[in-house]
Regions:
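Acetyl-CoA-dependent GNAT
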Residues: 4-77, 88-89, 94, 125, ...
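Conserved beta-strand-loop-alpha-helix junction that forms the acyl-donor binding cleft
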Residues: 105-114, 131-136
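Conserved GNAT acetyl-CoA-binding A-motif
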Residues: 95-108
Length: 166
């Protein structure tokens, strides 16, 4: 069951992130060197985890009034056990409880465990014309960091009965 991370568990999530990122080498994607996203977390209320000790995590924030899934990582040794799906469900539930109309994310379009996986879990591609200013800035920031080494898409899962007007 997904839960909020305990502050003392954050350092252990670095191994989860690095191991999950290593899978991308199978499809020719190598991330630029540097600190992991989880190492930059200062607020434990931005991280949901699954497992004891955590085998996966969801790092969340707010972008244009939507809950944004900054990263979802599951240790490869624990993949295909429903951990990612439970984390996405917990993110969706948190978005609903917080009054967010949707959950957004950016991901690789053609990596099987990225956009196609998210589509099976309720996300759909969000056309660029519908991106808000913060989402546009986030995508540009990812490009500057060198993350866009393969085609990427923005996806959204509507969690409220209808999207709120801008």
């Amino acid at each position: 069951m997904a839960r909020w991370v305990e502050p003392g568990e954050l350092p252990g999530l670095v191994e989860v992130e690095l191991a999950a990122d290593g899978l991308f080498e199978q499809v020719g994607i190598v991330f630029p060197p540097g600190t992991t996203m989880i190492e930059e977390v200062t607020d434990p209320s931005a991280v949901l985890v699954e497992g004891e000790p955590p085998a996966g995590f969801a790092l969340i924030g707010w972008v244009d009034g939507n809950l944004h899934l900054d990263q979802l990582a599951v240790h490869p040794s624990r993949m295909r056990q429903g951990i990612g799906g439970r984390l996405v469900a917990a993110v969706r539930d948190h978005a609903t409880a917080s009054g967010a109309p949707a959950v957004t994310l950016t991901t690789y379009r053609d990596v099987p465990w990225n956009a196609p996986w998210y589509a099976r879990h309720g996300f759909s591609v969000l056309p660029e014309a519908e991106w808000g200013p913060e989402l546009r800035a986030l995508v540009e920031h990812e490009r500057e960091l060198g993350i866009e080494v393969a085609p990427r898409v923005v996806m959204r899962m509507v969690v409220a009965g209808r999207m709120m007007a801008d």
